[in-house]
Every structure is written in C-alpha cells, then in structure tokens.
Amino acid sequence: MKLLTGNSNKNISQKISKFLKTKLVHSSIKKFSDGEIYIEINENIRGNSIFLIQSISSPANDNLMELLLCIDALKRSSAKNITAVIPYFGYARQDRKVAPRTSISAKLVSNLITKAGADRVVTVDLHAGQIQGFFDIPVDNLFATPIFSRHIKRNVKGKNLICVAPDVGGVERTRALARKLDLGIAIIDKRRPTPGKSQVMNVVGNVKNKTCIIVDDIIDSGGTIVNAAEALINRGAKEVHVYITHGVLSGEATEKIKKSKIKNLVITDTIDNSNKIKKAKNIEVLSICNLLGEAIKRISNSTSVSDLFK
C-alpha cells in the first residue's frame, strides 16, 4: 500500500500518512505557463495498491483535472489498483436535473473518475447518497456522524437538546445523529429563490428553551445556516450549535458566521480552510484523518469498512 497526495489538501494527506505510518509517494505536480497541469510520479509504484488523496474543492476545476491526471499517471505507471480518496466530492450538488436543459455534473464526474482508471472511491458524506450508484466501481461513503456525536457529548452542555435539519433534504442525516445522541429532531422548511440565497419559512417542531444542534453536509455561502439559526432563536431556542462536514465557506461566509446568532460552527478538514478561519473565533475544525486512515487500512486489509459506523 502506498499513498499519493494531490495539491488540494496536503494537510489531511500528511495526517493520514502519519496515522498509517506510511510515507507519501514522491511526485511532481506543476503547471505549464498556459495553465495545463503536469503530473509525474517520481518513484517506482509498479504492482502497488495506491490510495490517491485529493478533494474536489476550490479551485474545483483545477483540482478535478489534477485528480484525473494523477489517476491516469498511476495507471500508466502500472499500479496494481487505484483508490481515489476524495474527502470532499465537488460537483455533487448537481445530482439531478432541477430545470430543463441542465447538466447532471455528479454523474459526469463519476464517469470521468471511472474512465480515468480508478478502481474504487472513498469519500465522506456525499451530498446525495444515490451518487454512489452513478459509479460502476465500488464507492465507500464514510460519515462524520461518529466524530460529531463524540464532540457534542463532550462540549455541548445541558439536557434540553434537539437536533435540527436545515432543510427537508437533510432529515436522514439529522436523524442519524439524533439516534446516536438519543435526541428528538426539528426541521426547517426552507425556500431558495436563487442559487446561493435562501429564506427560512417555517420551523417544524418545538425548539423553545432548547439548545439546537444543526447538522448538514455542506456550508457554502453560509446563508442557509445563518438564516436557520436566526429562525430558531426567534422561536425561543436557547442557543444554536452547528455541525457541518464540508466547510466550503465561499465569499463572505466566515464574516456572516462571526456576526450571526450561531454560538459555534464545527466543520471537518475535508477542505483546507486554514487561511479562511484564522480570525473566526466561533469556527472549530475537527480532523477526519483518523476515520479516513482507518478506512484505507481496512480496504487494504480487505476487512469491513461499515463496521466503523456500528
């Protein structure tokens, strides 16, 4: 087993390498003057099982192309098999046609990864579980729920807690966390007039005098979560804690969160946000490297990955 990292999130790759006590494969990933990406594997990997770690995060197009070219380089270097470890699977939000004459980018990206030569994919909290079915190769979709539940038990005080889904699509994810914590759930009915903008309409469930725990897979511009927190406080919630797997945090998201009614936002390091959150005191990052490292170890040893979540 050998590990290779792309440029999208070297921090998490180094942590996984340390967890597995395995050095990263030496490689050169450069750009030509016209922006084309150049990949070279600088050591022999013939006959080895390779785990390539690369998130499809901003700049999404460059990081996607880098992922595909790395897979191609590994294939042409006679790797025995290639597992694409994609902590954040970009383009997953376009998983169906939401309007006439639109693309389904999640399916296209799945095809590209498969055609490039990947034998397996490992990712974390896919935006829609059915994306696993877009692939013709095995996909292990890991969950941040165990990491979040441990943090909540240690850090969120009080007995009157409730888990909150920020929209109807997040109910299953919220229910999974609520089961682990033995809590009830509430749901926010959200209407989105345009992409990137949201308006909270209604809260389904009693949140008065309760500590609310919002759970979701992605925070992008921050509008959905900030509006959700405000709606909960306006309906009598005591305080709002937010747990989100992928911190995209585009534009002025960190500023919105700093000024919002959110007591604290907890994200994972599937996306490298070290520069964005330096001044945001109410944003905390939990590392998901041990979960990914353990999954890689189990795949390499042909043992169960699903047992991690029992």
Residue ranges of model-derived segments:
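PRPP-associated nucleotide enzymes
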Residues: 1-310
